[in-house]
Amino acid sequence: MDARATIHDYYDSLRHGAPLDTFFADDRPEDDAVVKCGVSERLVGADSVKQGLRDQTASTSDWAVDSRDLRVTQRDTVAWFSDDVGLAWDEGGQRHEFDTRWSGTLEHRAGDWSFVGLHVSVATDL
């Protein structure tokens, strides 16, 4: 699977309520920690990111993920991407819907592509 396919697989897993934590790399002692910024949180360190994603999967449902402009560049062991994503989900009896911007970095480790950084922000007019 290449980096683009990994990103599509992540989107599909989000839509279907499947585990997301496995898409993220473990921290390495020689590197700074993995970071994931979502619409409402910033998680630092692989353990925090993975627990945050498990909590998200447990507390949300009915995800809509509409990728509108995925752009991926892949090199030997690193890839980066950006996307414009329509995002919606149910949580606590309330529907949340946002136009979001995604960017991130993946690294090829042990035969798989894993996120080492992910940033999701809400697009707003000024």
PLM features: residue spans?
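Hydrophobic/aromatic beta-strand elements that line small-molecule binding cavities or substrate pockets
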Residues: 53, 67-72, 85-87, 100-108, ...
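A solvent-exposed, acidic/Ser-Thr-rich amphipathic alpha-helical stretch
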Residues: 21-70
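Hydrophobic residues on conserved beta-strands that form the core of alpha/beta folds
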Residues: 65-67, 82, 115
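Short, cysteine-centered beta-strand-loop-beta hairpins and adjacent loop/turn segments enriched
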Residues: 88-96
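Short beta-strand edge/turn micro-motifs at domain boundaries
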Residues: 80, 97-126
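Short, aromatic-enriched amphipathic alpha-helices that serve as compact interaction elements
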Residues: 1-19
